Structure formats: C-alpha cells, structure tokens
C-alpha cells in the first residue's frame, strides 16, 4: 500500500461574511437576439444531423397540404374540414411548440425553425419534436391533439373507426395515454398530410418546401375580413398574449392590449405579402400549388367551396362529410370565447358578419385605414358610416372575377 498523503488542516474563521447581494446580469435586446439565433441554430443542426426517415410505402403519391392563415380567421374550422376526411392525417399548429420553446424570438427569426419542422412532419418524421417536447410523451403532447381525427383512429387509437366523425371529448378520454410513436405510424398510413399553421408571415420562406422533390406541397391560403378578425381577437381575450409578443418582437414580453392595432396591421401586411408573392410574377414551382380562400365565401357556400378545395388537393367529398359540413354550418349563434380553438355547430353566415354589430364605427374606420391594402386586394368593401356598417343588405364581400388569383389553380 502506498503512503497516504497528509492533508494539512486549514483554520476556518468563525466569522460569517456579510450577505452578498444577488447580482442578475442585464442583456441588451441585441444580445438576446444573438443568443436566440445561436439557440435556434443549435436546434436546427440537431434536427438536420439526425438520420432521415425511411421512405414510406406509397410516399411518392402522398399529397402535402399547408393551410396557411392567421389567428381568428376561421382556420380551425377549415382545418376540421380536412381533419375529418378519412384520407387525411392532420395536425393543428405544430409550430406552437417552436414558439413556446423559443418565445423570446420574433416571427422572422423563428421562420426557419418552423419551416424545417413542417418538412419533417410532412415526411412523417416525428422525432423532430425531440427538440421541443419532453423525451417521455404521449399523443396528447401535441398542441390541441384531439382536433386530429387521425390521432383518434387506428392505428393511433381505436376511439373512432376511419370514415366516422370524431369527437374531441371522447378522444381525450380514450386516447390521451397512447404512445407518441404511434403518430409516425398513423401519418404513414394516409395519402394526405395536412398541417394548419398561423405562424408564417411571408411565402418566400416556404419556397424550399415548394421546390423540394421529396414533397408534393399545396398551399391553401385562408383570409378573412380584417374587421371580423379584430372583433374575434378582442373576444378571445388574453389567449393570444404570448403569440402577440412574438409577432411584435418584444423579446418574450406578452402583449394583451393592442390599442394602436399593431397586430392587425401586421396580419394584414402578411396576407398582402403572401397573396402578391403568389399572384405577381410567382416562381414556376408555385404554379398550380396555391389557392386563396376567403372565409366569407366558405361561410356562404361551404359545400361548393370545400368541393373546390378537395379537388385542388386530390380529395373527394363523401356523403357523410357532406352531411356533417351542413350540420356544423347551420347551427345557431356565433360561438363563445371558450370555443376559440374549437369547431362547433353554429350559423356560419352569422359568424362572418358578427363584427358589423359588435365593433364601434370609429374602430372600424381605424381598421380600414391600417388595412386598406388588404381590403382592396382581397375584395372587401369599406363602409363610410355607422348606417352602412349595420345595413346587412349591403354586401361587403366583393365578387371574385374570372381572373382573380389566376395562379390559384393549375392550367
């Protein structure tokens, strides 16, 4: 045995040092942005470095659809029109996980991370969520997971047979603890993968997906009268506070009140940017891959509009879906704030015009001012008096001409 070294004893003072003040570092907004970009880059490198998914059976024929919209524009309703189709694997706003994880970022700095998340999901690679979710997770880890009929049907769960209309409350009861790994298996068993997203603010960031030979992507761009969007946002209350902060680039500060209408201005600008990019000298790879839909047209003629959307995306309207669509668009009332992210049976036409009685005329004038370009481009008529506002015989949705959005459909 070797000799054990002796450790000299150190005399310790019995006097206690004075309590030190806690020092918290302060970072400038520029430093926060740099740190956030570094974090995002690390996440992207992690995602890219993982082995890619194996080619699914029939993957070459799979259709990928991105329902592109903004908050409170009827996108949850349109998402359900796709989700309930028996050939569709649907997820609602998967980029919620990116924005929640990187909430100090801005919409622009998070665009790339959101886009790469979309690509992985379209290819049924659910391992991409490792960067945004706990390692131990179930199907219920997805944001608003029960809105996906595919996650409530085999092979993900046996709550509802394929071809039947799912119900969220039943799905939550029976499928909450299903393994997360079943999402990939379910995704690969469908001919269509549809994602609904509200976190893209220009079309150019999606060009790599539109030109990607591994994808067969269609863009469904849903818009709504900005005056109706404002009324719906106000009714939703603080639900969107975190997202509002990211849209406005507040470095993680939540934003509830928006007296200067900065948010609705940005929403209008984003719709104009996207629509103009798709219709004014668009790149060749966009031909036949973009379709603009107004919520008001969907509310007035739901079956005609959904038939056109299904044809655009290669789906067929079944008798059961037709009956279900009629029922959910011919209910009563306009919905409650608690239904902010849910689709219930209500009168779609009344929903689309509720703002005409709910908003003060002075606020409508302000919206028309900050969203003048969007109103003109998307076909919404301004009002110039409170009487015009409340006169429901005055149609404020202009007809679409034969050349309107000529790039919406393939030649």
UniProtKB/Swiss-Prot annotation:
Glycans are attached at residues 138, 327, 350. It is an enzyme of class 2 (transferase). Pfam families: Sulfotransfer_1. It is a single-pass type II membrane protein. The chain crosses the membrane at residues 31-48. Predominantly expressed in small and large intestines and colon. Weakly expressed in lymphocytes. Not expressed in other tissues. Down-regulated in colonic adenocarcinomas. The keyword Transmembrane helix applies. Residues 1-30 are cytoplasmic. Belongs to the sulfotransferase 1 family. Gal/GlcNAc/GalNAc subfamily. Sulfotransferase that utilizes 3'-phospho-5'-adenylyl sulfate (PAPS) as sulfonate donor to catalyze the transfer of sulfate to position 6 of non-reducing N-acetylglucosamine (GlcNAc) residues and O-linked sugars of mucin-type acceptors. Acts on the non-reducing terminal GlcNAc of short carbohydrate substrates. However, it does not transfer sulfate to longer carbohydrate substrates that have poly-N-acetyllactosamine structures. Has no activity toward keratan. Not involved in generating HEV-expressed ligands for SELL. Its substrate specificity may be influenced by its subcellular location. This is Carbohydrate sulfotransferase 5. It comes from Homo sapiens (Human). The gene is CHST5.
